């Protein structure tokens, strides 16, 4: 668009409420009234006449400034198989009279009869019903734990599974509700157990006379009260403080002799300061701005004594005289997605698939409806962001904890802590138990975190008891332990298959957030400070930022993917009493809270606008957002090569894209096997020198659990063999059994003769070198005639790393 003064601006900037043309022609009434919306858009009308997608019309959220997009909308109607709450929301009929308030107004539990359970069910003391098989199995399923009460389970005592009375380590406290927490969190004034048992029977803290007692009972040094910094967790040390500092503000003047007087007493021909500094003869009545604006580049403001330089909005003073443009885009939260810096201002733009909302200036998704999927212990539920649809997706589960989806294939994956398995099914077939596929069914202890690589069709999971991070293909046929560290407690995990990285939280000692390649290499700690109990973690791919919740600090924080620009989004001991997981979409952050038994949302940039999404849940843990824009397309280099599976005999894993020269993928072998010299084939760990374990192997600080590959392994020559056959081939690489013992009598004499010949040759060569004069240099660099070079060689389908070579200093 060409402004009337000749300047050109982007056409999408006209009539957006901000003036880009200096003459204002981009926001003039004539310009805006001439705008016509394209087919599929809705015109807000009015003076601005902005266009929004038709799908935003009557969606319950005002997008036009004049609210025209929500005018004349008919009331939302629920389908025949849904229950309509009094507030107009729709929920699944199974949620009605289930003893849980699923309508925010509670209308689904009004006038409900006393529930009765079927013959194959057990009725909890709270009147809810659970399958009879879940009662007295050593795992509490009723909200009040009554299914495991001794009076109900005497007849089942012999059939109970063996369980440790205290599964926690010596450095942990065992909550009565079953969790393990750090022993240092016991009686610290902050509830960490679900049942608050960590704060029971605690001695009341008494502070010394020189200390201040916070409202939560903790003590801080008395000098920290009213020091303008929050030292108490409940911020009570800064309440009721009078932080008035003398001579601050535009109406105060500080004399050079120390007094503070009112500004109206300056230059009034009366001495108010002892040193007469309020009545300087040369400066009173002088306007320095009349002479070349006092040297100011933009605005000169005359004062009673002296003058000051000011800058227009969007500029900052750099040397008391000169103004410089402020780059607002240095703030990662200036815009929700793309920030364009302009002279004196900035513009926000959106990624493909999003459109800037006229009213809030936030990027809003276009197209399909976004859903929240979340676990509720015995089921997975599905809910739209406006709660207009709220249903049960996967019912009758034992103890579902972790969750993730693959949007393109319309599949959902989840882990069950009680079953110690990872499952998957098609979302449209989720209610059918017969459609569940067991992806990982063995060698799991506590699969707390789960993430799907939607580009390379792999799943990654954490195990907090084994202290491992593992990978498998989405069918569960091939798997490998990528990382294991003693004392670690990995929890949640998120992947970035576009760039080849994964991130996970670890609440072991010390707590941290780790980053590594999706092939297990280059693992390091990204966050190690101001972190205590990191739980859920999620990734904003478009913005390149990580978000996580800390259950001990009651906070939501963010950081860029390289560990910089850390920000605290929200701290709230009430709404973040015990946050477990979180999800990001558009400008919103959604999180589950175990103690509140609820799901909340807030603005992910400011932490404001907190809303209750769902309540009265039963241990809500993981939460994911289902929308096609959350999983952008990428290149699967393992399938782009001429060789099947990238030429890898077992797993082909994406490599981290650290720089433009980084490999696209590397091969990996199952636990207990190593890569051969070709960096594609797999050999047993007993293979002698001649094989090499290069950087494409995993980074593990301890040996992971060994898994038997139940799948067939495909070689580069497309030869298929079983795991047992693969071991036989590796064994034959170590030694071949001779056909007859008599061959030894022929081979050994020949070998001895060859050794005798080479020995004689080396003795002669040594004598010859000693008889020749040599030149010695003090600088040791001259003693090395052959340079050590390490090259990363690129083949047709990937990258390989050469084996190490010894360089002689004499040769």
Curated annotation (Swiss-Prot):
GO annotation terms (biological process): cholesterol homeostasis; cholesterol metabolic process; receptor-mediated endocytosis involved in cholesterol transport; transcytosis
Region (Required for MYLIP-triggered down-regulation of LDLR): 765-811
Compositionally biased tracts (Polar residues): 689-708
Cellular component annotations (GO), alphabetically ordered: cell surface; clathrin-coated pit; early endosome; Golgi apparatus; late endosome; low-density lipoprotein particle; lysosome; plasma membrane
Secretion signal, residue range per the UniProt entry: none
Glycosylated residues in this chain: 66, 125, 243, 628, 699
Stretches of the chain found on the membrane's Extracellular side: 1-743
Membrane-protein topology: Single-pass type I membrane protein
Record's comment on post-translational modification: N- and O-glycosylated.
Location(s) in or outside the cell: Cell membrane; Membrane, Clathrin-coated pit; Golgi apparatus; Early endosome
Segments forming domain LDL-receptor class A: 1-33, 36-74, 77-113, 116-154, 167-203, 206-242, 246-285
Motif (NPXY motif): 777-782
Listed transmembrane segments: 744-764
PROSITE patterns noted in UniProt: ASX_HYDROXYL, EGF_2, EGF_3, EGF_CA, LDLRA_1, LDLRA_2, LDLRB
Keyword Chaperone: no
Domain EGF-like: 285-324, 325-357
Topological domain spans for side Cytoplasmic: 765-811
Location of region: Disordered: 686-708
Region feature Clustered O-linked oligosaccharides, mapped onto this chain: 692-722
Cystine pairs: 3-21, 15-32, 37-51, 44-64, 58-73, 78-90, 85-103, 97-112, 117-129, 124-142, 136-153, 168-180, 175-193, 187-202, 207-219, 214-232, 226-241, 247-260, 255-273, 267-284, 289-300, 296-309, 311-323, 329-339, 335-348, 350-363, 638-652, 648-667, 669-682
Molecular function in Gene Ontology: calcium ion binding; lipoprotein particle binding; low-density lipoprotein particle receptor activity
Family: Belongs to the LDLR family.
Subunit organization: Interacts (via NPXY motif) with DAB2 (via PID domain); the interaction is impaired by tyrosine phosphorylation of the NPXY motif. Interacts (via NPXY motif) with LDLRAP1 (via PID domain). Interacts with ARRB1. Interacts with SNX17. Interacts with the full-length immature form of PCSK9 (via C-terminus). Interacts with PGRMC1 and TMEM97; the interaction increases LDL internalization.
Medical condition linked: Defects in LDLR are the cause of familial hypercholesterolemia (FH).
Description of its domains: The NPXY motif mediates the interaction with the clathrin adapter DAB2 and with LDLRAP1 which are involved in receptor internalization. A few residues outside the motif also play a role in the interaction.
Protein name stated in the entry: Low-density lipoprotein receptor
Species, as recorded: Sus scrofa
Gene designation: LDLR
């Amino acid at each position: 668009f060409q402004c009337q003064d000749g300047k050109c601006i982007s056409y999408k900037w006209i009539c957006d409420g901000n003036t880009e043309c200096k003459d204002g022609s981009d926001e003039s009434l004539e310009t805006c009234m001439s705008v016509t919306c394209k087919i599929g858009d809705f015109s807000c009308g009015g003076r601005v006449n902005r266009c929004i997608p038709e799908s935003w019309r009557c969606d319950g959220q005002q997008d036009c400034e004049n609210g025209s997009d929500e005018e004349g909308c008919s009331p939302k109607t629920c389908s025949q198989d849904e229950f309509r709450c009094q507030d107009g929301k729709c929920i699944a009929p199974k949620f009605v009279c289930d003893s849980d308030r699923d309508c925010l107004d509670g209308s689904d539990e009004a006038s409900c009869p006393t529930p009765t359970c079927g013959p194959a069910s057990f009725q909890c003391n709270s009147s809810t019903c659970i399958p009879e098989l879940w009662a007295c199995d050593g795992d509490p399923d009723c909200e009040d734990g009554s299914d495991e009460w001794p009076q109900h389970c005497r007849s089942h005592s012999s059939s109970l599974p063996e369980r440790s009375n205290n599964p926690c380590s010596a450095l942990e406290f065992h909550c009565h509700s079953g969790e393990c927490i750090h022993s240092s969190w016991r009686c610290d004034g902050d509830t960490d157990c679900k049942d608050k048992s960590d704060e029971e029977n605690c001695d009341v803290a008494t502070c010394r006379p020189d200390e201040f007692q916070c409202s939560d009972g903790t003590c801080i040094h008395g000098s920290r009260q009213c020091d303008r910094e929050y030292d108490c967790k409940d911020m009570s040390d800064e309440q009721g403080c009078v932080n008035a500092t003398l001579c601050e503000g535009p109406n105060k003047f500080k004399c050079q002799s120390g007094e503070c007087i009112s500004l109206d007493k300056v230059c009034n021909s009366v001495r108010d300061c002892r040193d007469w500094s309020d009545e300087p003869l040369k400066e009173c009545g002088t306007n320095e701005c009349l002479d070349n604006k006092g040297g100011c580049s933009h605005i000169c403001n005359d004062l009673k004594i002296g003058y000051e330089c000011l800058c227009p909005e969007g500029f900052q003073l750099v040397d008391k005289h000169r103004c410089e443009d402020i780059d607002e885009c240095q703030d990662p939260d200036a815009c929700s997605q793309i920030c364009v810096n302009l002279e004196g201002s900035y513009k926000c733009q959106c990624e493909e698939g999003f459109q800037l909302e006229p009213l809030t200036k936030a990027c809003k998704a276009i197209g399909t409806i976004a859903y929240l999927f979340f676990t509720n212990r015995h089921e997975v539920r599905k809910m739209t962001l406006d709660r207009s649809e709220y249903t049960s997706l996967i019912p009758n589960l034992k103890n579902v904890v972790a969750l993730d989806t693959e949007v393109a294939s319309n599949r959902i994956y989840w882990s069950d802590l009680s079953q110690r398995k990872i499952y998957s099914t098609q979302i449209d077939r989720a209610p059918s138990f017969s459609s569940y596929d067991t992806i990982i069914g063995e060698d799991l202890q506590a699969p707390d975190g789960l993430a799907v690589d939607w580009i390379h069709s792999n799943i990654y999971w954490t195990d907090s008891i084994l202290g491992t991070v593992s990978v498998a293909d989405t069918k569960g046929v091939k798997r490998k332990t990528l990382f294991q560290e003693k004392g670690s407690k990995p929890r949640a995990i998120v992947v970035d298959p576009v760039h080849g990285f994964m991130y996970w939280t670890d609440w072991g000692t010390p707590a941290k957030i780790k980053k590594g390649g999706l092939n297990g290499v280059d693992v390091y700690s990204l966050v190690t400070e101001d972190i205590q109990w990191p739980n859920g973690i999620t990734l904003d791919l478009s913005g390149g930022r990580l978000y996580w919740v800390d259950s001990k600090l009651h906070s939501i924080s963010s950081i860029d993917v390289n560990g910089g620009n850390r920000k605290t989004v929200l701290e709230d001991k009430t709404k973040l009493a015990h946050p477990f997981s979180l999800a990001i979409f558009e400008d919103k952050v959604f999180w589950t809270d175990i103690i509140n038994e609820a799901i909340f949302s807030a603005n992910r940039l400011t932490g404001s606008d907190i809303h209750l999404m769902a309540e009265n849940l039963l241990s809500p843990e993981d939460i994911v957002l289902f929308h096609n824009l959350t999983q952008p397309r990428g290149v699967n280099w393992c399938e782009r090569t001429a060789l099947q599976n990238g030429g890898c005999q077992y797993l082909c894993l994406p490599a981290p894209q650290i720089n433009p020269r980084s490999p696209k993928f590397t091969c990996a072998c199952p636990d207990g096997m190593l890569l051969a010299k070709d960096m594609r084939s797999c050999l047993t760990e007993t293979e002698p020198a001649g094989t090499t374990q290069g950087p494409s192997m995993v980074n593990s600080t301890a040996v992971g659990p060994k898994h038997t590959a139940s799948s067939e392994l495909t070689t580069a020559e497309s030869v298929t063999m079983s795991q047992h056959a693969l071991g036989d081939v590796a064994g034959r690489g170590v030694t071949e059994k001779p056909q007859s013992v008599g061959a030894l009598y022929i081979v050994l004499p020949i070998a001895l003769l060859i050794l005798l010949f080479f020995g004689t040759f080396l003795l002669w060569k040594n004598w010859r070198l000693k008889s020749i004069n040599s030149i010695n240099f003090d600088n040791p660099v001259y003693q090395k005639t052959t340079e050590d070079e390490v090259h990363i060689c690129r083949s047709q389908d990937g990258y390989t790393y050469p084996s190490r070579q010894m360089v002689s200093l004499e040769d």
